[in-house]
């Protein structure tokens, strides 16, 4: 049950939001055992983000929570796909994207 959040200072159109959601759905499958059918996504544009002391640089913070554990190679492939996606869809340079992953040992869905 992965959860991916994208927070950026870039304005996101409806079509860009849909493209991001599709791309994140594809990228999450690079993590073993994860699929788009379990994925929840939060996309937030036009946030007040200061990067390198400036508010005029396109930047993004992507956080990902996953149940269980995956190896480093899977996460690296996921991160590469996500940074490419943000560059393609929102023109955010790779160096202006911060990503984190938290592995959650207990994840509750459907109240169980």
Which role fits each region the language model picked out?
Residues 1-112:
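Interaction-mediating elements
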């Amino acid at each position: 049950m992965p959860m991916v959040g994208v927070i950026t200072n870039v304005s996101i159109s409806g079509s860009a939001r849909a493209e991001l959601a599709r791309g994140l759905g594809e990228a999450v499958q690079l993590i073993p055992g994860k699929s788009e059918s379990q994925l929840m996504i939060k996309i937030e544009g036009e946030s007040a983000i200061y990067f390198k002391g400036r508010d005029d640089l396109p930047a993004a913070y992507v956080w990902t929570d996953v149940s269980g554990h995956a190896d480093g190679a899977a996460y690296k492939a996921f991160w590469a796909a996500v940074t490419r996606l943000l560059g393609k869809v929102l023109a955010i340079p790779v160096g202006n994207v911060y990503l984190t992953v938290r592995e959650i040992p207990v994840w509750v869905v459907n109240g169980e």
